């Protein structure tokens, strides 16, 4: 039987599997264990701006909501964090289910102050990033093509440098958490040349970050004995809602229900395989 990690790394077109020898074999389970050992409040950070489209992408926010709903079902308080380019779409999708914090796009000093205040206000037990562009060694933020998007990306890294229980989910090397293996990212031709240097306690990789997030929730389900992973139908509804709110496919830059070039059906197939895995393990709702 394929493992959760096998499933979320299937169809790896970007080469993120180059990191697999460097992360835990069961990296989704390791991240799930950190969460289970940290009951309380989870901050979930997401949102990645697509420069040429002038909008945020569909990879990240759907995974954030699937993680958030799963954690809520396990008794966690959930708080979402993004910046002005993604916050409206999260509000559109979740309604009043959880607070959504608009992290300002501002200087390092003001960003760090905002992060410290936010951590003080909510006292999160764990902080999770999924497909969140992270800071390079130069203190800038770059997309997969190497273009500087610093003006469109809040410096949410300070939430992670100021907390000791953190998880990063990424697929390309420029996301928060990739600092754990920045040297491997930089040496892998298919990944970004200017990797994120922000580290996290645990790193989850996937062919898309959403898939990595779904794998994390599958692992949480297995560890808790309760299936809290979104159904195929609900995952499609979440993605459709974000598209309705204006998010774009990061590959085509079109406002369509695709994620990194993967269609609805391709995304659904990954969710179904994870659900089949949980069923085979005897995990039910």
PLM features per residue range, with description:
Residues 1-41:
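Positively charged, low-complexity intrinsically disordered leader regions
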Residues 19-23, 46-62:
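Short, glycine-rich nucleotide/cofactor-binding loops
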Residues 41, 125-126:
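Structural motif
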Residues 56-61, 126-127, 132-226:
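Conserved mixed alpha/beta catalytic, RNA-binding, or beta-rich assembly cores of soluble enzyme
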Residues 57-75:
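Histidine-anchored nucleotide/phosphate-binding helix
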Residues 76-85:
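Short internal beta-strands
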Residues 94-118:
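A glycine-rich helix N-cap at a beta->alpha junction
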Residues 176-285:
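C-terminal functional extensions of proteins
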């Amino acid at each position: 039987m394929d493992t959760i990690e096998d499933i979320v790394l299937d169809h790896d077109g970007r080469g993120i599997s180059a990191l697999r020898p460097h992360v835990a074999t069961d990296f989704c389970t390791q991240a799930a264990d950190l969460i289970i050992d940290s009951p309380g409040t989870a901050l979930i950070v997401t949102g990645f701006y697509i420069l040429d489209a002038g909008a945020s992408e569909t990879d990240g926010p759907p995974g954030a909501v699937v993680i958030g709903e799963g954690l809520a079902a396990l008794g966690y308080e959930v708080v979402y964090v993004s910046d002005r380019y993604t916050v409206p779409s999260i509000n559109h999708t979740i309604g009043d289910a959880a607070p959504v914090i608009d992290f300002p796009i501002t200087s390092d000093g003001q960003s760090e102050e905002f992060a410290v205040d936010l951590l003080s206000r909510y006292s999160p037990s764990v902080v999770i990033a999924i497909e969140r562009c992270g800071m390079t060694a130069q203190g800038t933020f770059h997309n997969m093509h190497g273009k500087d998007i610093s003006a469109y990306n809040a410096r949410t890294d300070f939430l992670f440098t100021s907390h000791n229980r953190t998880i990063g989910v990424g697929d390309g090397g420029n996301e928060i958490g990739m600092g754990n293996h920045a040297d491997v990212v930089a040496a892998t031709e298919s990944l970004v040349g200017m990797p994120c240097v922000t580290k996290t306690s645990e790193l989850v990789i996937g062919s898309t970050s959403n898939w990595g997030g779904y794998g994390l929730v599958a692992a949480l389900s297995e560890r808790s004995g309760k299936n809290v992973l979104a159904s195929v139908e609900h995952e499609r509804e979440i993605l459709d809602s974000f598209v309705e709110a204006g998010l774009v496919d990061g590959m085509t830059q079109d406002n369509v229900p695709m994620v990194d070039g993967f269609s609805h059906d391709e995304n659904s197939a990954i969710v179904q395989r994870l659900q089949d895995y949980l069923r085979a393990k005897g995990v039910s709702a």
